[in-house]
């Protein structure tokens, strides 16, 4: 805190104490009265007005023009206009043109505390300041923007910059973009169509395999046949489906190995959910081969051990259903759904909690009213009825017969409608946000041509340094420009407050 009055024995003050203060904030010039500033001596301008020397005053501003007696501040001019209103009324209002964090930084710089905020703006400011900074407010029903997140684009550019020092980096980068971005080029679109076709063919083959006329023998029977030394032809699958399965596995293995070899970062490759889905889609096939080899080596094993290995083989085959998740790489909706579930764990938890409470309450009521009827003999048995009723599925396998049971069922159904509808609305809004955001990002990539996109990626190494130097030069030259061209010397053009 700078002393408000000069010390004893000092010479003539460097400026009259009651002289108006001439300030220039980001090109906005104002003349402030000493009496208005004296009302708030703890603020930066109040301390500047009471400065005992020019040296103390220079510590409080960015620059000082001794000839014009003008103090320069390289700060936001819009906030300065709100600051003038504060010196007139004693209340500070939040500006919509500034985010809450930038507003807080400006307020701290000028020496204003939270008590200076007007009552109409204080609650909104504190609520937004406590919230964690996110790309968008997760607690808000209306997303603020659907523009692509700059952080996501920066992460992609940072990863692609690794190709600059790699061997055959330009070729690897082009192949990587072809495999990862369906809208990057015509070959990438063809590759995406082939990949989708292989995934659909694999799923269709798995479904056809379950039909009786195409279904292979049960795994346990096949193991027993091999153990008995009978022909292996008796236990093989349909040859057409088997060849189709081999082709799909070969394609999936090619995709995984190619992405692994072309990936800019191996560590980030194994952390990406879509890459893990690709690995899981081919892993059951190779595990089945290992299990088959183990079965071949255990011809003398007991029937129980062979039956257990046969069940393991069945589990591995069942894991092929995860191949349908590979479509998420080529579907904007599936990727948006995954992002929605990732950012909606609170709402999903609340939904499950509401359902659990409702099922427990209404199951107890139904057990009391329908204890003698079949299906309601225990409270855990009533949980199935409560879950089906609250989710409004209504299989009808268990039906209450008494008046009390029917009333409980009515309350359970109505409560389920309300309980499920509330969190679902929030989840749907988030899905809409992520979907529009993903579509906007894809549109931004498609709008730029392939050559422009390549030039952008090839220059990503020098973008940061050039931007940094440019911003420094601009910040250093901007203030002199304001002082020389935008700051007239005539006091008559300054506004007095």
Curated annotation (Swiss-Prot):
Tagged with keyword GTP-binding: no
Region (Disordered): 464-497
Segments in the Cytoplasmic topological domain: 1-186, 263-273, 331-345, 436-497
One GO CC annotation: perinuclear region of cytoplasm
Biased composition (Basic and acidic residues): 470-482
Family matches, as InterPro entries: BTB/POZ_dom, Ion_trans_dom, K_chnl_volt-dep_Kv, K_chnl_volt-dep_Kv5/Kv9, SKP1/BTB/POZ_sf, T1-type_BTB, VG_K_chnl, Volt_channel_dom_sf
Oligomeric and partner information: Heterotetramer with KCNB1 and KCNB2. Does not form homomultimers.
Known function: Potassium channel regulatory subunit that modulate the delayed rectifier voltage-gated potassium channel activity of KCNB1 and KCNB2 by altering their kinetics, expression levels, and shifting the half-inactivation potential to more polarized values. While it does not form functional channels on its own, it can form functional heterotetrameric channels with KCNB1 and KCNB2. Each regulatory subunit has unique regulatory properties that can lead to extensive inhibition, significant changes in kinetics, and/or substantial shifts in the voltage dependencies of the inactivation process.
Name this polypeptide is given: Delayed-rectifier potassium channel regulatory subunit KCNS1
Protein source organism: Mus musculus (Mouse)
Classification of source organism: Eukaryota, Metazoa, Chordata, Craniata, Vertebrata
Encoding gene, per UniProt annotation: Kcns1
């Amino acid at each position: 805190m700078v002393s408000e009055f000069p010390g004893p024995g000092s010479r003539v003050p460097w400026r009259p104490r009651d002289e108006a203060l001439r300030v220039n904030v980001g090109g906005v010039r104002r003349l402030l009265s000493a009496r208005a500033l004296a009302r708030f001596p703890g603020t930066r301008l109040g301390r500047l007005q009471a400065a005992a020397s020019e040296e103390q005053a220079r510590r409080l501003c960015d620059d000082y023009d001794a000839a014009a007696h003008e103090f320069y501040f390289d700060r936001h001019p819009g906030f300065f206009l709100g600051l003038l209103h504060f010196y007139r009324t004693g209340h500070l209002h939040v500006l919509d043109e500034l985010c809450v964090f930038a507003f807080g930084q400006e307020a701290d710089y000028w020496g204003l505390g939270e008590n200076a905020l007007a009552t109409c703006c204080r609650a909104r400011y504190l609520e937004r300041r406590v919230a964690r900074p996110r790309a968008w407010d997760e607690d808000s029903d209306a997303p603020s923007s659907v523009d692509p997140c700059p952080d996501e684009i920066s992460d992609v550019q940072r990863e692609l910059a690794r190709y600059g020092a790699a061997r055959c980096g330009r070729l690897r980068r082009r192949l990587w973009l072809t495999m990862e971005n369906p809208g990057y080029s015509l070959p990438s679109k063809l590759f995406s169509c082939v990949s989708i076709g292989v995934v659909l063919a694999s799923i269709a083959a798995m479904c056809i395999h379950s039909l009786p006329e195409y279904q292979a023998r049960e795994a346990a029977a096949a193991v027993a046949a091999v153990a008995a030394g009978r022909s292996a032809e008796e236990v093989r699958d349909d040859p057409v489906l088997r060849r189709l399965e081999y082709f799909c596995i070969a394609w999936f293995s090619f995709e995984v190995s190619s992405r692994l070899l072309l990936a800019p970062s191996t560590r980030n490759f194994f952390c990406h959910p879509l890459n893990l889905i690709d690995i899981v889609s081919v892993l059951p096939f190779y595990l089945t081969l290992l299990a088959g080899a183990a079965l071949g080596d255990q011809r003398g094993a007991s029937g129980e051990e062979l039956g257990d290995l046969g069940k393991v083989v069945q589990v591995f085959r069942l894991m092929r259903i995860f191949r349908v998740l590979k479509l998420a790489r080529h579907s904007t909706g599936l990727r948006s759904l995954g992002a929605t579930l990732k950012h909606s764990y609170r709402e999903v938890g609340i939904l499950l909690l509401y359902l659990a409470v409702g099922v427990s309450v209404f199951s107890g009521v139904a057990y009391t009213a329908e204890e003698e009827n079949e299906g309601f003999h225990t409270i855990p048995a009533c949980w199935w009825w409560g879950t089906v009723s609250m989710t409004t599925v209504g299989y009808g396998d268990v039906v209450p017969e008494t008046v009390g049971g029917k009333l409980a069922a009515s309350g359970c159904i109505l409560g389920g409608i309300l309980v499920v509808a509330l969190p679902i609305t929030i989840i749907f809004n988030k899905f809409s946000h992520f979907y529009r955001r993903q579509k906007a990002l894809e549109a931004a990539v498609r709008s730029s041509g392939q050559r422009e996109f390549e030039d952008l990626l090839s220059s990503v190494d020098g973008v940061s340094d050039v931007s940094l130097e440019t911003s420094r030069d601009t910040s250093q030259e901007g203030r002199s420009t304001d002082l020389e061209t935008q700051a007239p010397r005539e006091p008559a053009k300054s506004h007095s407050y």
